[in-house]
Regions:
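Glycine-biased, small-residue-rich flexible motifs in mid-sequence functional cores and linkers
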Residues: 1-200
Length: 200
């Protein structure tokens, strides 16, 4: 069972899943908002978990650029649906909010871990912007997808600041994010159907 609000057709649309840490600095927030804007410009959907930090930055970037976003929530669906910030874009059929849990459910770590499967399953590809090392929901969700789920290719942000977290995910089969800088390049990435890397 999925509870939700918005245009259910968006659940079949695919798109780019963007995930990451809750506690991040302004530089990563701005980076993630740019990714969201690019997804919107490409005419694709942005899929994320709706949590503070990277998730909301990605969704905000897409929606403010006139695009579509799909939030897979671990808790408080009713509150999110009634939030004034979400109301207009829900009515415009540009935002869908869903949850596998009761709309009144409060936050639970297990719920957050479980909903990660849906984020990946609804996407054509996924980008991990940031993560803690060997702990937290972003790490657990990415590792589960790489080692067991393998629904879609998992990309990781790679630059001079990413360090051992992204290197560790690449060893598990993640791909370096190629930083597409045009809508056409992003669409090509999402439709190329790259097979998820298999670890040995």
């Amino acid at each position: 069972i999925l509870y939700g609000c918005g245009d259910a057709a968006m659940l079949d649309a695919g798109g780019l899943a963007v995930v990451g840490s809750r506690n991040v600095g302004d530089t990563l927030v701005e980076y993630t908002e740019r990714i969201g804007r690019l997804v919107a410009e490409a005419g694709c959907s942005l899929i994320s978990g709706g949590a503070r930090g990277i998730d909301r930055a990605a969704m905000r970037g897409a929606l403010e650029a006139g695009g579509q976003a799909l939030g897979v929530l671990a808790d408080s669906l009713e509150r999110a649906v009634l939030n004034r910030e979400n109301r207009d874009v829900l009515l415009e059929n540009r935002l869908v909010l869903i949850s596998p849990f009761d709309p009144l459910a409060i936050f639970n770590v297990g719920y957050a871990m479980y909903r990660n499967k849906l984020i990946y399953a609804l996407a054509d590809a996924a980008l991990v912007v940031s993560s803690d090392y060997e702990k937290g929901g972003t790490w657990a969700g990415a590792v589960e997808q790489l080692e067991r789920g393998r629904f879609v290719p998992v990309y990781v942000r790679v630059d001079e600041e990413t360090g051992r977290v992204m290197e560790a995910l690449q060893r598990k089969g993640a791909l370096p994010w190629p930083n597409p800088d045009t809508p056409e390049a992003l669409r090509e990435l999402l439709t190329s159907r790259v097979s998820p890397k298999k670890t040995t």
